[in-house]
Amino acid sequence: MSTLRTALTELVGVQHPVVQTGMGWVAGPRLVAGTANAGGLGILASATMTYTELESAITKTKTLTDKPFGVNIRADASDAPHRIDLLIRESVRVASFALAPKQELIAKLKAAGVVVIPSIGAAKHAKKVASWGADAVIVQGGEGGGHTGPVATTLLLPSVLDAVDIPVVAAGGFYDGRGLAAALAYGAAGVAMGTRFLLTQESTVPDSVKHEYLARGLQDTTVSRKVDGMPHRVLNTDLVNSLEHSGNMRGLVAAARNASKFKAMTGMKWSTLVKDGLAMKKSSDRTWQQIIMAANTPMLLKAGLVEGNTHAGVLASGQVVGLLDDLPTCKDLIDGIVADAIKRIDALGALRA
């Protein structure tokens, strides 16, 4: 089939300018390999994995695909340097970050031939990581799921494109060929999608949860600060409504309880959790209350996206959920998006007088 050659496809060595984001509890080997084999860039989510689990996930992904893929890493995690060493040792093609990695980590990855692609939410952040040597950035507008900002993609994307000279990947509100064509027209090098890939055959999210997503409309997401203290776009559920109307003390008690569960699940020491909290506070403007509340995120997402408990869990989602009504394979999804984008780009060319 025809394809689209962009700065992203040239940089990473993938066939199509389509990225599957590193969603916690969702982006595992099966989904990442499915995306890679379909010609896109799949990214493993390591924030909800122990170091040993990440090792296994990389090995498993390599048995399922020989195509390039990436790993998303928490730059403020205490073991981030060890995880970066693992990526280098395993020749992982892309390292992505939700928070800007330190300049020396970027340099180390680049020296080893790993492509560095942080996610950013403002033009000033894009300029900073570009000056530090980042190869590209992913910029997510407010329509996107999970942690998100207040500015729509249609405004945030051009502001970032005007600020940096490295490839920019657009995220937030993308799901079809029209979106890809529009992003390329803005000057982006491709699109990144989370919710759209969550709703595919290769996604390991329980079918009952997928159908919960498919039943939702454009008005069925909300941006809540009660999940972890930061703006978090999620599906409207009874739990989220309850959290929104609960007092701060109740949220802190729940967060402390979930921190204990996360510690038990990962085998982390309390000293490591505290060290990560200190790093998080140093790298952001979060209060200690927000940092304690951040313990909510892994366990609440796990309850919904892994255990299928939509009553006790949180379901991160972009607004695009209201436009989705199918569960395609990654290949059918990417092939369809690219073919439609090419058709629409060709149609635009016909408008010239």
From Swiss-Prot:
Q: Its catalytic activity?
A: (3aS,4S,5R,7aS)-5-hydroxy-7a-methyl-1-oxo-octahydro-1H-indene-4-carboxyl-CoA + NAD(+) = (5R,7aS)-5-hydroxy-7a-methyl-1-oxo-2,3,5,6,7,7a-hexahydro-1H-indene-carboxyl-CoA + NADH + H(+)
Gene3D superfamilies in the record: Aldolase class I
Q: Which UniProt keywords apply?
A: Cholesterol metabolism, Flavoprotein, FMN, Lipid metabolism, NAD, Nucleotide-binding, Oxidoreductase, Steroid metabolism, Sterol metabolism
Give the Enzyme Commission number. 1.3.1.-
Species whose genome carries this gene: Rhodococcus jostii (strain RHA1)
Concerning SUPFAM superfamilies, the annotation shows: Inosine monophosphate dehydrogenase (IMPDH) (SSF51412)
What does it do?
Answer: Involved in the final steps of cholesterol and steroid degradation. Probably catalyzes the introduction of a double bound into the C ring of 5OH-HIC-CoA, leading to the formation of (5R,7aS)-5-hydroxy-7a-methyl-1-oxo-3,5,6,7-tetrahydro-2H-indene-4-carboxyl-CoA.
Give any single GO term for biological process: cholesterol catabolic process
PANTHER family cross-referenced by the UniProt entry? 2-NITROPROPANE DIOXYGENASE, 2-NITROPROPANE DIOXYGENASE-LIKE PROTEIN
Residue ranges annotated as transmembrane are none
Annotated FMN binding sites = 22-24, 171-173, 194-195
The identity of this protein, by name, is (3aS,4S,5R,7aS)-5-hydroxy-7a-methyl-1-oxo-octahydro-1H-indene-4-carboxyl-CoA dehydrogenase
Any one GO molecular-function label of the UniProt entry: nucleotide binding
Q: Which gene encodes it?
A: ipdC
* Effect of deleting the gene: Deletion mutant does not grow on cholesterol or HIP, but grows as the wild-type on pyruvate. In the presence of cholesterol, disruption mutant accumulates 5OH-HIC-CoA.
Pathway listed for it is: Steroid metabolism; cholesterol degradation
Q: What class of enzyme is it?
A: oxidoreductase
Family, per the entry?
Answer: Belongs to the nitronate monooxygenase family.
